[in-house]
Amino acid sequence: MKSFLIQVSGIVQGVGFRPFVYNLAIKHNIKGWVNNDDRGVNILLNCKEQEAQNFIKELQENPPVLAKINSINIEKITEIKECKSFEIKQSSNSNNKSTIISPDMSICNDCIEDINDMSNFRYNYSLTNCTNCGPRYSIIKTVPYDRVNTSMSSFMLCENCAKEYNNPTNRRYHAQPVSCEVCGPNVTLYNKYNEILESNINAVEKAADLINKGFILAIKGMGGFHLVCDASNDKVVNQLRINKNRPNKPYAVMFKDINSIKTYTKINLKEEETLCSKEKPIVLVKKKDDFSLSKLIAPNINQIGCFIAYTPLHHLLFRYLKNPILATSANLKDEPIIRSKDEVLNKLSLVVDYILDFNRDILNACDDSVIQIVENCNIKLRNARGYAPTSLKLEKTTNKKILALGANQKSTISLAFENNLILSPHIGDLNSIESVEYFERTIETFKRFYDFEPDIIVCDKHP
Protein backbone atom coordinates (compact mmCIF):
# COMPACT_ATOMS: atom_id res chain seq x y z
CA MET A 1 0.00 0.00 0.00
CA LYS A 2 1.28 3.46 -0.97
CA SER A 3 0.13 7.07 -0.60
CA PHE A 4 -0.25 9.54 -3.45
CA LEU A 5 -0.97 13.27 -3.20
CA ILE A 6 -2.71 14.59 -6.31
CA GLN A 7 -3.16 18.31 -6.99
CA VAL A 8 -5.70 19.25 -9.67
CA SER A 9 -5.91 22.78 -11.08
CA GLY A 10 -8.39 24.39 -13.45
CA ILE A 11 -12.14 24.90 -13.16
CA VAL A 12 -12.52 22.38 -10.34
CA GLN A 13 -14.47 24.29 -7.68
CA GLY A 14 -18.22 24.78 -7.73
CA VAL A 15 -18.64 22.11 -10.40
CA GLY A 16 -19.20 18.98 -8.29
CA PHE A 17 -15.56 17.92 -8.41
CA ARG A 18 -15.13 16.79 -4.79
CA PRO A 19 -18.25 14.53 -4.77
CA PHE A 20 -17.15 13.19 -8.15
CA VAL A 21 -13.75 12.29 -6.64
CA TYR A 22 -15.46 10.82 -3.56
CA ASN A 23 -17.73 8.56 -5.63
CA LEU A 24 -14.84 7.57 -7.89
CA ALA A 25 -12.80 6.54 -4.84
CA ILE A 26 -15.73 4.55 -3.44
CA LYS A 27 -16.14 2.85 -6.83
CA HIS A 28 -12.45 1.80 -6.81
CA ASN A 29 -12.51 0.96 -3.08
CA ILE A 30 -9.74 3.50 -2.39
CA LYS A 31 -9.23 5.18 0.98
CA GLY A 32 -8.04 8.77 1.49
CA TRP A 33 -9.53 12.26 1.27
CA VAL A 34 -10.25 15.22 -1.00
CA ASN A 35 -10.45 18.94 -0.27
CA ASN A 36 -10.42 22.40 -1.87
CA ASP A 37 -7.83 25.06 -1.36
CA ASP A 38 -7.21 28.37 -3.12
CA ARG A 39 -5.11 26.64 -5.81
CA GLY A 40 -7.63 23.93 -6.75
CA VAL A 41 -8.39 20.43 -5.44
CA ASN A 42 -6.13 18.13 -3.40
CA ILE A 43 -6.60 14.35 -3.30
CA LEU A 44 -4.81 11.84 -1.05
CA LEU A 45 -5.03 8.19 -2.09
CA ASN A 46 -4.05 5.11 -0.03
CA CYS A 47 -3.78 2.38 -2.67
CA LYS A 48 -1.56 0.39 -4.99
CA GLU A 49 0.18 2.23 -7.82
CA GLN A 50 -1.93 0.57 -10.54
CA GLU A 51 -5.13 1.52 -8.68
CA ALA A 52 -3.92 5.14 -8.50
CA GLN A 53 -3.21 5.13 -12.24
CA ASN A 54 -6.69 3.74 -13.01
CA PHE A 55 -8.22 6.38 -10.73
CA ILE A 56 -6.35 9.24 -12.43
CA LYS A 57 -7.17 7.92 -15.92
CA GLU A 58 -10.90 7.98 -15.16
CA LEU A 59 -10.55 11.38 -13.48
CA GLN A 60 -9.05 12.80 -16.68
CA GLU A 61 -11.36 11.08 -19.13
CA ASN A 62 -14.73 11.57 -17.40
CA PRO A 63 -14.65 14.71 -15.22
CA PRO A 64 -17.85 16.52 -14.14
CA VAL A 65 -19.76 18.32 -16.90
CA LEU A 66 -18.66 21.84 -15.92
CA ALA A 67 -15.09 20.97 -14.91
CA LYS A 68 -12.02 21.91 -16.93
CA ILE A 69 -8.78 20.27 -15.78
CA ASN A 70 -5.70 22.32 -16.63
CA SER A 71 -3.11 20.21 -14.83
CA ILE A 72 -2.70 17.20 -12.55
CA ASN A 73 0.38 16.94 -10.35
CA ILE A 74 1.06 13.56 -8.69
CA GLU A 75 3.45 13.12 -5.79
CA LYS A 76 4.31 9.77 -4.20
CA ILE A 77 4.47 10.20 -0.43
CA THR A 78 7.17 8.16 1.29
CA GLU A 79 5.60 8.50 4.73
CA ILE A 80 2.37 6.53 4.33
CA LYS A 81 -0.68 8.32 5.71
CA GLU A 82 -3.14 5.54 6.54
CA CYS A 83 -6.84 6.42 6.14
CA LYS A 84 -9.72 4.26 7.35
CA SER A 85 -12.17 5.45 4.69
CA PHE A 86 -12.49 8.09 1.97
CA GLU A 87 -13.77 11.46 3.12
CA ILE A 88 -14.37 14.99 1.91
CA LYS A 89 -12.45 17.41 4.11
CA GLN A 90 -13.07 21.09 4.76
CA SER A 91 -11.40 23.64 2.49
CA SER A 92 -7.92 24.80 3.44
CA ASN A 93 -5.98 27.97 2.70
CA SER A 94 -2.59 27.86 1.00
CA ASN A 95 -2.07 31.62 0.59
CA ASN A 96 -1.32 31.00 -3.09
CA LYS A 97 -4.57 31.66 -4.94
CA SER A 98 -4.61 30.20 -8.43
CA THR A 99 -7.87 28.24 -8.65
CA ILE A 100 -9.95 29.17 -11.68
CA ILE A 101 -13.37 30.76 -11.10
CA SER A 102 -16.16 28.93 -12.93
CA PRO A 103 -18.41 30.94 -15.25
CA ASP A 104 -22.16 31.03 -14.60
CA MET A 105 -23.99 28.22 -16.39
CA SER A 106 -27.51 27.75 -17.72
CA ILE A 107 -30.02 25.55 -15.90
CA CYS A 108 -29.50 21.82 -16.53
CA ASN A 109 -32.21 19.40 -17.67
CA ASP A 110 -32.41 17.74 -14.23
CA CYS A 111 -33.22 21.07 -12.56
CA ILE A 112 -35.79 21.87 -15.28
CA GLU A 113 -37.48 18.58 -14.37
CA ASP A 114 -37.38 19.52 -10.67
CA ILE A 115 -39.18 22.85 -11.13
CA ASN A 116 -41.87 21.18 -13.24
CA ASP A 117 -42.38 18.15 -10.95
CA MET A 118 -45.33 18.75 -8.61
CA SER A 119 -44.02 16.10 -6.20
CA ASN A 120 -40.62 17.82 -5.85
CA PHE A 121 -40.13 20.36 -3.06
CA ARG A 122 -38.49 22.69 -5.61
CA TYR A 123 -41.59 22.71 -7.83
CA ASN A 124 -42.04 26.27 -9.17
CA TYR A 125 -38.89 27.51 -7.39
CA SER A 126 -37.29 30.16 -9.60
CA LEU A 127 -33.75 29.89 -8.19
CA THR A 128 -33.21 26.13 -8.41
CA ASN A 129 -29.66 24.95 -9.21
CA CYS A 130 -27.16 22.14 -8.60
CA THR A 131 -23.45 21.43 -9.09
CA ASN A 132 -24.08 21.10 -12.85
CA CYS A 133 -25.69 24.50 -13.35
CA GLY A 134 -26.51 27.93 -11.97
CA PRO A 135 -24.57 30.98 -10.78
CA ARG A 136 -20.86 30.88 -9.98
CA TYR A 137 -18.86 33.97 -11.00
CA SER A 138 -21.77 36.35 -10.43
CA ILE A 139 -22.16 35.41 -6.73
CA ILE A 140 -18.58 34.84 -5.55
CA LYS A 141 -16.65 37.21 -3.28
CA THR A 142 -13.38 35.29 -3.11
CA VAL A 143 -11.93 31.77 -3.22
CA PRO A 144 -12.16 29.03 -2.10
CA TYR A 145 -15.64 28.69 -3.57
CA ASP A 146 -17.58 27.97 -0.38
CA ARG A 147 -21.03 29.23 0.56
CA VAL A 148 -19.57 31.64 3.13
CA ASN A 149 -17.66 33.34 0.28
CA THR A 150 -20.77 33.93 -1.86
CA SER A 151 -23.88 36.10 -1.79
CA MET A 152 -25.72 33.03 -0.42
CA SER A 153 -23.86 33.26 2.91
CA SER A 154 -26.83 34.80 4.77
CA PHE A 155 -29.29 32.06 3.73
CA MET A 156 -29.31 29.13 6.18
CA LEU A 157 -30.20 25.75 4.68
CA CYS A 158 -33.50 24.13 5.63
CA GLU A 159 -33.62 20.42 6.56
CA ASN A 160 -34.44 19.23 3.02
CA CYS A 161 -31.71 21.32 1.37
CA ALA A 162 -29.17 20.40 4.07
CA LYS A 163 -29.74 16.68 3.41
CA GLU A 164 -28.86 17.15 -0.27
CA TYR A 165 -26.01 19.57 0.45
CA ASN A 166 -24.33 17.11 2.84
CA ASN A 167 -24.86 13.94 0.78
CA PRO A 168 -21.81 13.19 -1.41
CA THR A 169 -23.91 11.01 -3.72
CA ASN A 170 -26.39 13.84 -4.43
CA ARG A 171 -25.85 16.23 -7.35
CA ARG A 172 -26.41 19.13 -4.93
CA TYR A 173 -23.60 18.10 -2.60
CA HIS A 174 -21.85 21.37 -1.70
CA ALA A 175 -23.69 23.21 -4.49
CA GLN A 176 -23.09 26.57 -2.82
CA PRO A 177 -26.19 28.44 -4.16
CA VAL A 178 -28.52 25.53 -3.29
CA SER A 179 -31.81 26.59 -1.68
CA CYS A 180 -35.57 26.30 -1.94
CA GLU A 181 -38.60 28.51 -1.36
CA VAL A 182 -38.48 27.74 2.39
CA CYS A 183 -34.87 28.76 3.07
CA GLY A 184 -33.58 30.66 0.05
CA PRO A 185 -34.00 33.88 -1.86
CA ASN A 186 -37.39 34.57 -3.37
CA VAL A 187 -38.84 36.37 -6.37
CA THR A 188 -40.88 39.55 -6.01
CA LEU A 189 -42.78 41.68 -8.54
CA TYR A 190 -42.71 45.46 -8.03
CA ASN A 191 -44.27 48.38 -9.84
CA LYS A 192 -42.14 51.40 -10.77
CA TYR A 193 -43.06 53.01 -7.44
CA ASN A 194 -41.30 50.19 -5.54
CA GLU A 195 -44.58 48.69 -4.31
CA ILE A 196 -44.76 44.89 -3.94
CA LEU A 197 -47.44 43.31 -6.13
CA GLU A 198 -46.79 39.54 -5.95
CA SER A 199 -44.23 37.02 -4.71
CA ASN A 200 -42.75 33.70 -5.90
CA ILE A 201 -44.66 31.81 -8.62
CA ASN A 202 -47.55 34.30 -8.47
CA ALA A 203 -45.03 37.05 -9.26
CA VAL A 204 -43.75 35.07 -12.26
CA GLU A 205 -47.25 34.40 -13.59
CA LYS A 206 -48.28 38.04 -13.13
CA ALA A 207 -45.08 39.24 -14.84
CA ALA A 208 -45.82 37.03 -17.85
CA ASP A 209 -49.38 38.39 -17.96
CA LEU A 210 -48.05 41.97 -17.98
CA ILE A 211 -45.64 41.14 -20.83
CA ASN A 212 -48.50 39.54 -22.78
CA LYS A 213 -50.50 42.77 -22.28
CA GLY A 214 -47.76 44.96 -23.76
CA PHE A 215 -45.83 46.29 -20.76
CA ILE A 216 -42.05 46.67 -20.42
CA LEU A 217 -40.42 44.83 -17.50
CA ALA A 218 -36.96 44.78 -15.95
CA ILE A 219 -36.25 41.14 -15.07
CA LYS A 220 -33.27 40.03 -13.02
CA GLY A 221 -31.09 37.47 -14.77
CA MET A 222 -27.95 35.70 -13.63
CA GLY A 223 -25.47 38.54 -14.13
CA GLY A 224 -27.75 41.56 -14.35
CA PHE A 225 -31.19 42.82 -15.36
CA HIS A 226 -32.80 42.50 -18.79
CA LEU A 227 -35.34 44.89 -20.26
CA VAL A 228 -38.08 42.62 -21.55
CA CYS A 229 -41.21 42.94 -23.69
CA ASP A 230 -43.33 40.93 -26.15
CA ALA A 231 -41.18 40.40 -29.26
CA SER A 232 -44.24 40.24 -31.53
CA ASN A 233 -45.69 43.60 -30.43
CA ASP A 234 -44.58 46.50 -32.68
CA LYS A 235 -46.08 49.11 -30.38
CA VAL A 236 -44.18 48.05 -27.24
CA VAL A 237 -40.91 47.42 -29.12
CA ASN A 238 -41.15 50.92 -30.60
CA GLN A 239 -41.93 52.34 -27.15
CA LEU A 240 -38.84 50.65 -25.72
CA ARG A 241 -36.72 52.18 -28.51
CA ILE A 242 -38.11 55.62 -27.68
CA ASN A 243 -37.65 55.12 -23.92
CA LYS A 244 -34.05 53.92 -24.34
CA ASN A 245 -33.22 56.39 -27.12
CA ARG A 246 -32.03 53.48 -29.23
CA PRO A 247 -33.57 54.06 -32.67
CA ASN A 248 -31.92 51.35 -34.79
CA LYS A 249 -29.48 49.10 -32.92
CA PRO A 250 -30.71 45.48 -33.06
CA TYR A 251 -32.14 43.74 -30.00
CA ALA A 252 -31.85 40.05 -29.05
CA VAL A 253 -34.80 37.72 -28.57
CA MET A 254 -35.16 35.03 -25.91
CA PHE A 255 -37.08 31.89 -26.88
CA LYS A 256 -38.60 29.09 -24.83
CA ASP A 257 -36.65 26.35 -26.64
CA ILE A 258 -34.90 25.44 -29.88
CA ASN A 259 -38.15 24.47 -31.62
CA SER A 260 -39.48 27.97 -31.04
CA ILE A 261 -36.33 29.44 -32.60
CA LYS A 262 -36.78 27.22 -35.67
CA THR A 263 -40.27 28.67 -36.16
CA TYR A 264 -38.82 32.11 -36.91
CA THR A 265 -35.28 31.52 -38.21
CA LYS A 266 -33.16 29.45 -40.56
CA ILE A 267 -30.51 27.80 -38.39
CA ASN A 268 -27.86 25.25 -39.28
CA LEU A 269 -26.60 22.36 -37.15
CA LYS A 270 -23.65 24.31 -35.71
CA GLU A 271 -25.91 27.20 -34.70
CA GLU A 272 -28.35 24.78 -33.09
CA GLU A 273 -25.54 23.05 -31.21
CA THR A 274 -24.28 26.39 -29.87
CA LEU A 275 -27.74 27.65 -28.92
CA CYS A 276 -28.39 24.42 -26.97
CA SER A 277 -24.97 24.27 -25.30
CA LYS A 278 -24.61 24.56 -21.53
CA GLU A 279 -23.45 28.18 -22.02
CA LYS A 280 -26.67 29.24 -23.83
CA PRO A 281 -25.18 32.31 -25.58
CA ILE A 282 -26.90 34.71 -27.94
CA VAL A 283 -26.25 33.43 -31.47
CA LEU A 284 -26.69 35.53 -34.62
CA VAL A 285 -28.84 33.59 -37.10
CA LYS A 286 -30.76 34.31 -40.32
CA LYS A 287 -34.41 35.30 -40.15
CA LYS A 288 -36.94 33.35 -42.17
CA ASP A 289 -38.35 35.22 -45.17
CA ASP A 290 -41.75 35.29 -43.45
CA PHE A 291 -40.27 36.42 -40.09
CA SER A 292 -43.37 37.13 -38.02
CA LEU A 293 -41.93 38.81 -34.93
CA SER A 294 -41.71 42.60 -34.80
CA LYS A 295 -39.67 44.03 -37.69
CA LEU A 296 -38.49 46.70 -35.23
CA ILE A 297 -36.36 44.22 -33.26
CA ALA A 298 -33.57 44.12 -35.85
CA PRO A 299 -34.59 46.58 -38.57
CA ASN A 300 -33.10 46.43 -42.07
CA ILE A 301 -30.92 43.36 -41.45
CA ASN A 302 -31.59 39.70 -42.21
CA GLN A 303 -30.11 38.39 -38.95
CA ILE A 304 -31.37 38.26 -35.40
CA GLY A 305 -29.70 37.48 -32.09
CA CYS A 306 -31.44 34.48 -30.50
CA PHE A 307 -30.98 32.72 -27.19
CA ILE A 308 -32.80 30.10 -25.16
CA ALA A 309 -34.20 30.62 -21.65
CA TYR A 310 -31.23 29.90 -19.38
CA THR A 311 -32.44 30.31 -15.79
CA PRO A 312 -35.24 28.54 -13.89
CA LEU A 313 -36.99 31.92 -13.63
CA HIS A 314 -36.99 32.24 -17.43
CA HIS A 315 -38.36 28.71 -17.85
CA LEU A 316 -41.19 29.36 -15.41
CA LEU A 317 -41.94 32.66 -17.15
CA PHE A 318 -42.31 30.90 -20.51
CA ARG A 319 -44.92 28.62 -18.95
CA TYR A 320 -47.25 31.63 -19.09
CA LEU A 321 -45.90 33.70 -22.01
CA LYS A 322 -47.66 33.69 -25.38
CA ASN A 323 -44.67 34.76 -27.50
CA PRO A 324 -40.87 35.01 -27.50
CA ILE A 325 -39.55 38.06 -25.64
CA LEU A 326 -37.21 40.85 -26.58
CA ALA A 327 -34.46 40.75 -23.92
CA THR A 328 -31.74 43.39 -23.83
CA SER A 329 -29.30 44.44 -21.10
CA ALA A 330 -30.83 46.94 -18.67
CA ASN A 331 -28.59 49.97 -18.75
CA LEU A 332 -28.29 53.56 -19.89
CA LYS A 333 -26.19 54.42 -22.95
CA ASP A 334 -22.47 53.69 -22.36
CA GLU A 335 -23.16 52.35 -18.85
CA PRO A 336 -22.70 48.77 -17.56
CA ILE A 337 -25.55 46.33 -17.03
CA ILE A 338 -27.60 47.08 -13.90
CA ARG A 339 -27.33 44.61 -10.99
CA SER A 340 -29.91 45.85 -8.43
CA LYS A 341 -33.57 46.82 -8.26
CA ASP A 342 -32.71 50.15 -6.62
CA GLU A 343 -30.52 51.07 -9.58
CA VAL A 344 -33.33 50.13 -11.99
CA LEU A 345 -35.70 52.42 -10.07
CA ASN A 346 -33.12 55.20 -9.99
CA LYS A 347 -32.09 55.08 -13.65
CA LEU A 348 -34.85 53.37 -15.63
CA SER A 349 -38.11 54.42 -13.96
CA LEU A 350 -39.10 56.20 -17.21
CA VAL A 351 -38.23 53.12 -19.27
CA VAL A 352 -39.87 50.22 -17.39
CA ASP A 353 -43.37 49.63 -16.05
CA TYR A 354 -42.61 46.77 -13.63
CA ILE A 355 -39.63 44.97 -12.06
CA LEU A 356 -39.26 41.22 -11.43
CA ASP A 357 -36.53 40.89 -8.80
CA PHE A 358 -35.05 38.31 -6.41
CA ASN A 359 -33.01 38.87 -3.24
CA ARG A 360 -29.86 36.93 -4.17
CA ASP A 361 -27.33 39.69 -4.78
CA ILE A 362 -25.35 39.84 -8.01
CA LEU A 363 -21.81 40.61 -6.82
CA ASN A 364 -20.14 40.50 -10.25
CA ALA A 365 -22.07 41.70 -13.28
CA CYS A 366 -21.92 39.66 -16.46
CA ASP A 367 -23.62 40.33 -19.80
CA ASP A 368 -24.90 37.70 -22.22
CA SER A 369 -22.29 36.22 -24.54
CA VAL A 370 -22.75 36.84 -28.28
CA ILE A 371 -21.54 34.39 -30.93
CA GLN A 372 -21.57 34.26 -34.71
CA ILE A 373 -20.85 31.07 -36.62
CA VAL A 374 -18.31 31.64 -39.40
CA GLU A 375 -17.21 28.68 -41.55
CA ASN A 376 -18.58 26.33 -38.90
CA CYS A 377 -16.50 27.94 -36.13
CA ASN A 378 -17.74 29.88 -33.10
CA ILE A 379 -16.56 33.50 -33.25
CA LYS A 380 -17.13 35.29 -29.95
CA LEU A 381 -18.35 38.83 -30.50
CA ARG A 382 -18.84 39.21 -26.75
CA ASN A 383 -17.10 36.87 -24.31
CA ALA A 384 -19.23 36.87 -21.16
CA ARG A 385 -21.85 34.68 -19.42
CA GLY A 386 -21.12 30.97 -19.76
CA TYR A 387 -17.59 31.47 -21.07
CA ALA A 388 -15.97 34.06 -18.80
CA PRO A 389 -13.92 34.26 -16.69
CA THR A 390 -11.94 32.42 -19.37
CA SER A 391 -8.78 30.53 -18.39
CA LEU A 392 -6.01 29.68 -20.83
CA LYS A 393 -2.72 27.88 -20.25
CA LEU A 394 0.39 29.68 -21.49
CA GLU A 395 3.05 27.73 -23.37
CA LYS A 396 5.70 29.45 -21.26
CA THR A 397 5.70 30.40 -17.60
CA THR A 398 5.99 34.08 -16.71
CA ASN A 399 7.93 35.09 -13.61
CA LYS A 400 6.11 38.44 -13.58
CA LYS A 401 2.50 39.18 -12.70
CA ILE A 402 1.05 41.01 -15.69
CA LEU A 403 -2.21 43.00 -15.85
CA ALA A 404 -3.40 43.79 -19.40
CA LEU A 405 -6.10 46.44 -19.82
CA GLY A 406 -6.88 46.70 -23.52
CA ALA A 407 -8.28 49.93 -24.95
CA ASN A 408 -11.18 52.32 -24.46
CA GLN A 409 -13.68 50.41 -26.61
CA LYS A 410 -14.98 46.87 -26.00
CA SER A 411 -12.83 46.71 -22.88
CA THR A 412 -11.81 43.49 -21.16
CA ILE A 413 -8.99 42.89 -18.69
CA SER A 414 -6.67 39.90 -18.35
CA LEU A 415 -4.22 38.62 -15.76
CA ALA A 416 -1.11 36.56 -16.46
CA PHE A 417 0.77 34.71 -13.72
CA GLU A 418 2.83 31.52 -13.72
CA ASN A 419 1.43 29.69 -16.77
CA ASN A 420 -2.11 31.05 -16.38
CA LEU A 421 -3.95 33.64 -18.46
CA ILE A 422 -7.30 34.75 -17.01
CA LEU A 423 -9.65 36.82 -19.16
CA SER A 424 -12.48 38.79 -17.52
CA PRO A 425 -16.01 38.97 -18.93
CA HIS A 426 -16.79 41.75 -21.42
CA ILE A 427 -16.79 45.18 -19.77
CA GLY A 428 -17.67 47.45 -22.70
CA ASP A 429 -16.81 50.96 -23.86
CA LEU A 430 -15.30 53.23 -21.21
CA ASN A 431 -17.23 56.35 -22.18
CA SER A 432 -18.94 57.12 -18.87
CA ILE A 433 -18.05 57.49 -15.21
CA GLU A 434 -20.12 54.38 -14.44
CA SER A 435 -18.35 52.22 -17.04
CA VAL A 436 -14.93 53.34 -15.75
CA GLU A 437 -16.04 52.50 -12.19
CA TYR A 438 -17.16 49.05 -13.43
CA PHE A 439 -13.79 48.62 -15.17
CA GLU A 440 -11.93 49.53 -11.96
CA ARG A 441 -14.20 47.30 -9.86
CA THR A 442 -13.51 44.35 -12.18
CA ILE A 443 -9.76 44.89 -11.80
CA GLU A 444 -10.06 44.93 -8.00
CA THR A 445 -12.30 41.82 -8.06
CA PHE A 446 -9.78 39.79 -10.07
CA LYS A 447 -6.88 41.04 -7.96
CA ARG A 448 -8.79 39.81 -4.89
CA PHE A 449 -9.58 36.43 -6.47
CA TYR A 450 -5.89 35.72 -7.06
CA ASP A 451 -4.11 37.85 -4.41
CA PHE A 452 -2.73 39.57 -7.48
CA GLU A 453 -0.58 42.69 -7.41
CA PRO A 454 0.83 43.35 -10.89
CA ASP A 455 4.52 43.78 -11.58
CA ILE A 456 3.71 45.03 -15.08
CA ILE A 457 0.63 46.84 -16.43
CA VAL A 458 0.08 46.99 -20.20
CA CYS A 459 -2.59 48.59 -22.37
CA ASP A 460 -3.27 49.38 -26.01
CA LYS A 461 -1.52 52.54 -27.18
CA HIS A 462 -4.50 53.84 -29.13
CA PRO A 463 -7.33 55.55 -27.17
Report each predicted region and the residues it spans.
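Short, well-ordered amphipathic alpha-helical segments that serve as non-catalytic structural scaffolds
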Residues: 435-447
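Intrinsically disordered, low-complexity, mixed-charge
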Residues: 1-177, 181-188
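Internal gly/pro-rich beta-alpha loop/helix module
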Residues: 322-396
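Short beta-strand scaffold segments in enzyme catalytic cores
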Residues: 227, 282-284, 368-372, 411-416
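Gly/Thr-rich phosphate-binding beta-strand-loop-beta motif of the actin/hexokinase/Hsp70
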Residues: 397-420
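Gly-rich Lys/Arg/Thr-decorated short loops/hinges at beta-loop-alpha junctions or inter-strand turns
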Residues: 3, 157-158, 182-192, 220, ...
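A phosphate-binding glycine/aspartate-rich beta-alpha loop in the early core of alpha/beta enzymes
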Residues: 76, 224-287
